[in-house]
C-alpha cells in the first residue's frame, strides 16, 4: 500500500483520523500553530503538530489549518474567528496531551453539542427512515411502495399462502 510509507504511516489511516478529540466550534475559521523545530520547550508543540494536526484537519474540513515553523521564540496556537477576533493560546513547555486537552476545553465543541449534532444528522435528514421517532410511521406512506396489507389486501401473486400452496 503506497499510503503506508514514510514516517509513522499510522497517522494516515482512517481509524486514527476518526479518533481525534478536537472538533472546533463553528465560529473558528483559521487555526494556526507557531513553533520551532529546535529547543526543548517546543518539543510538545512539535509532537502535537506531528500527531494531532492530521486529526484536526480531518475532523474540521471547513477550517484552514496553518503551521508556521521557526518564526517565533515561543510556541503558540492562534485561532481566528469569523467575526474578526482572534485567540492566542500558549504552548510553551507543554506535552501534546496537555495541549489537546486544553484546546478541547477552550475552542472545542462540548460532548453535548457533538451528541446532539450526531443524533440530528442520523435520524431526520434521510427520507428513507421510517418508524418510531421519524416523520413516517410506516413504509406504506412513501409513494410507490406497496400499501399495508391491513388496509388494502395484497394481490394474489404477492401472497405466499397462494404461491406456495399445494395444487
Curated annotation (Swiss-Prot):
User: Could you tell me the superkingdom of the organism this chain comes from?
Assistant: Eukaryota
Do the record's keywords include Ribonucleoprotein? Answer: yes
GO molecular function terms listed in the Swiss-Prot or TrEMBL record: structural constituent of ribosome
Primary site of residence: mitochondrion
Report the Pfam families cross-referenced here: L51_S25_CI-B8
Description of how the protein assembles with itself and partners? Component of the mitochondrial ribosome small subunit (28S) which comprises a 12S rRNA and about 30 distinct proteins.
Provide the Gene Ontology terms for cellular component: mitochondrial small ribosomal subunit; mitochondrion
Is Thylakoid found in the keyword set? no
Protein family membership: Belongs to the mitochondrion-specific ribosomal protein mS25 family.
Q: Where in the cell is it found?
A: Mitochondrion
Keywords attached to this Swiss-Prot or TrEMBL record, sorted alphabetically, are: Mitochondrion, Ribonucleoprotein, Ribosomal protein
Q: Where does this protein come from, organism-wise?
A: Drosophila melanogaster
Query: Which InterPro entries does this entry report, sorted A to Z?
Result: Ribosomal_mL43/mS25/NADH_DH, Ribosomal_mS25/mL61, Thioredoxin-like_sf
Name of the protein in question = Small ribosomal subunit protein mS25
Q: Which GO terms describe its biological process?
A: mitochondrial translation
